């Protein structure tokens, strides 16, 4: 009986640990983030997932880039004070070109919608 009880306790502990890790994994993936995909001297590629009301931090782009939209929506390009500089409307399945940013200008990307926006960014380095 003791062996069965020990196995049951071990199984319960393992399941509880797995559930906790699963919840942690879900919390991690529900954050706005960039996921590197590929990089060399010519190009840098990443996936951006922009959750509602979780802006990407201030940054700039020194090179032009193609945006391939996996999940579309409206994206506000905001300044350091969170003031909207422009709004981009991206349709799922479409691709868009964005020029490099003006010298010295930084921006954040803010999704004010209800669903995540997901894009692949292909930044040309030459």
Predicted segments — roles?
Residues 1-10:
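Bacterial N-terminal signal peptides that target proteins for export
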Residues 10-22:
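Bacterial N-terminal signal peptides
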Residues 24-28:
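Boundary of Sec targeting at the N-terminus
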Residues 32-57, 62-68, 120-122:
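A short glycine-rich, His/Asp/Glu-containing loop-to-beta-strand
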Residues 39-42, 83-101:
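Short acidic-glycine-tyrosine-enriched beta hairpin
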Residues 53-57, 93-109:
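Histidine-centered metal-chelating micro-motifs
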Residues 61-81:
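Glycine- and acidic-residue-biased ligand/ion/polar-headgroup-sensing regions
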Residues 101-125:
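Ligand-binding loop in jelly-roll beta-barrel domains
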